[in-house]
């Protein structure tokens, strides 16, 4: 039997949680959900790329499990069978076979669970349900929505059925329409939807939207404190940094999984690399964070100031490790709950440290005479404009940024204090064939090295200009590094790879 792949996808694909008769059950589902016509054809037509061919072969180890699929089918279509007058006959046939094979009591028990739609029924059935994705957050040049759409498209390419709820076009309260429904998974990207409460102000809406929930969180976990104090079953956080996963587990008691965002490539012919070194990012606002510290009451001001000094002095520490040292300085011993409360109160210091080192990295490059091309309004009046080799261009969208990287021989990344992380910017630069210039992160160890990119240490910025000049002065070496980085990144950091890994997460639950 040959079936159009799109028909298979729309029906929910093969249900791998069934131990046997997977193709049979899928064909039943297709017939139940859409009009089907059987047409006799030749083998050449069946072999077309848009067709999926099924045969009658079962894996030997699964041949004795078909009765469970029969029970599941009876549970799934019980209403239709009763309406057609076949329900009792189908039950009798399944039980007669069970009697003959000596598993009558086991079958009765399992069948009752399927017809009654107990937990095991939904465990199986959810695997053929659509994946619900929340999108529509316009922050950061729409990057969160782009992530949601990229992952969704990759899942569809793997045969998954994906539904989107656009939070920009719809009131988030409209998510109530999904109450009581089951999904293969529910995915958000830095989404507040998982924090929506019911009218009783006790329970959360997603306690009643069934299926595993996954929320990408791309910042330090301290910023998400108001949204991660809820606890309900089957909720997981996807993070880009292993130290963030550790933070979630320790301080929020939340299951967190290292799952960095993937890169994207501009779909275009080869372009001339007209820039030596680019930075596609904002200048930041160190002075803004200093002003915030000055405005705080004395105890908080002192704590925030010491926190900032510690982060500046020890730039390779995680934010929480630097805050621990800050507390030690004042002789403060706190419980985990108190630690989070205190750190949340001074969380803006993290931005201060990020912007301080972004300024220092870029100024170090400029002082060495290297030309740096930057993009966006934030550079127009920044202190670094005094350097004639800082070349400012108009702002770019995410898609235009991909083109800039294609035009760059190398491009700079300064981590937003992700000490164990990997970002879409890093992946995108390498996939564009530019050499990535980045501060070190624990994620790189064992995955990339200086044959793939330029890695610098925030504690030794004096070494950075020499590293850049060395590669810019040797085009053959630059091309080797760029190609090595691109090859590794295309293998491990595409959205198609993330879709594959996400489905593995679901399969291994």
Task: Mark where each language-model region is.
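C-terminal, non-catalytic tails of nucleotide-sugar-dependent glycosyltransferases
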Residues: 60-121, 371
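Catalytic binding pocket for nucleotide-activated donors in carbohydrate/polymer assembly enzymes
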Residues: 132-139, 146-159, 163-170, 230-231, ...
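Active-site proximal beta-strand in glycosyltransferases
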Residues: 40, 204-220, 236-239, 278
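Conserved nucleotide-sugar donor-binding catalytic segment
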Residues: 1-73, 84-85
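Structural motif
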Residues: 184-187, 212, 236, 410, ...
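Nucleotide-sugar donor-binding catalytic core of glycosyltransferases
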Residues: 129, 134-147, 251-419, 441-444
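N-terminal pre-catalytic "stem/leader" segment of glycosyltransferase-like enzymes
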Residues: 105, 119-212, 343-346, 352, ...
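Glycine-rich, charge-decorated loop segments at or immediately adjacent to ligand/cofactor-binding or catalytic sites
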Residues: 221-235
């Amino acid at each position: 039997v040959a079936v159009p792949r799109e028909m298979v996808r729309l029906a929910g694909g093969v249900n791998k949680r069934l131990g046997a008769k997977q193709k049979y059950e899928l064909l039943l589902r297709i017939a139940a959900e859409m009009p089907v016509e059987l047409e006799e054809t030749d083998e050449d037509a069946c072999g077309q790329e848009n067709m999926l061919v099924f045969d009658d072969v079962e894996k030997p180890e699964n041949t004795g499990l078909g009765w469970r699929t029969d029970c599941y089918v009876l549970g799934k279509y019980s209403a239709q069978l009763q309406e057609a007058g076949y329900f009792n006959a189908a039950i009798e046939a399944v039980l007669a076979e069970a009697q003959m094979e000596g598993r009558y009591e086991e079958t009765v028990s399992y069948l009752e669970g399927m017809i009654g739609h107990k937990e095991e029924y939904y465990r199986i059935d959810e695997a053929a349900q659509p994946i619900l994705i929340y999108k529509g957050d316009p922050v950061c040049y729409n990057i969160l929505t782009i992530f949601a759409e990229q992952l969704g498209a990759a899942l569809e390419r793997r045969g998954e059925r994906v539904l989107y709820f656009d939070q920009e076009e719809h009131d988030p309260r409209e998510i109530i329409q999904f109450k009581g429904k089951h999904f293969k998974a529910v995915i958000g990207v830095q989404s507040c939807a998982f924090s929506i409460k019911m009218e009783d102000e006790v329970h959360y809406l997603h306690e009643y939207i069934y299926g595993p929930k996954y929320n990408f969180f791309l910042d330090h976990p301290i910023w998400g404190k108001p949204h991660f104090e809820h606890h309900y079953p089957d909720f997981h956080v996807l993070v880009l940094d292993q130290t963030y996963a550790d933070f979630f587990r320790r301080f929020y008691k939340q299951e967190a999984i290292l799952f960095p965002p993937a890169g994207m490539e501009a779909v275009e012919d080869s372009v001339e690399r007209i820039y030596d070194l680019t930075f596609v990012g904002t200048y930041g606002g160190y002075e803004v964070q200093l002003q915030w510290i000055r405005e705080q009451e004395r105890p908080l001001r002192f704590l925030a100031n010491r926190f900032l000094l510690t982060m500046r002095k020890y730039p390779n520490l995680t934010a929480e490790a630097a805050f621990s040292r800050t507390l030690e300085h004042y002789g403060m011993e706190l419980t985990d709950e108190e630690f989070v409360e205190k750190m949340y109160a001074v969380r803006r210091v993290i931005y201060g440290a990020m912007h301080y080192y972004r300024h220092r990295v870029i100024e170090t490059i400029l002082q060495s005479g290297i030309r740096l091309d930057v993009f966006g309004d934030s550079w127009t009046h920044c202190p670094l404009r005094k350097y004639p080799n800082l070349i400012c261009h108009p702002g770019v969208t995410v898609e235009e940024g991909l083109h800039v990287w294609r035009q760059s021989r190398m491009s700079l990344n300064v981590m937003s204090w992700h000490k164990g992380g990997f970002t879409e910017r890093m992946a995108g630069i390498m996939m564009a064939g530019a050499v990535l210039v980045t501060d070190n992160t624990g994620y790189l160890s064992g995955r990339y090295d200086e044959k793939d990119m330029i890695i610098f240490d925030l504690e030794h910025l004096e070494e950075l200009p020499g590293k850049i000049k060395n590669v810019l002065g040797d085009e053959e070496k630059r091309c080797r590094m760029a190609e090595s980085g691109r090859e590794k990144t295309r293998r491990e950091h595409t959205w198609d790879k993330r879709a594959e890994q996400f489905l593995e997460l679901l399969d291994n639950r």
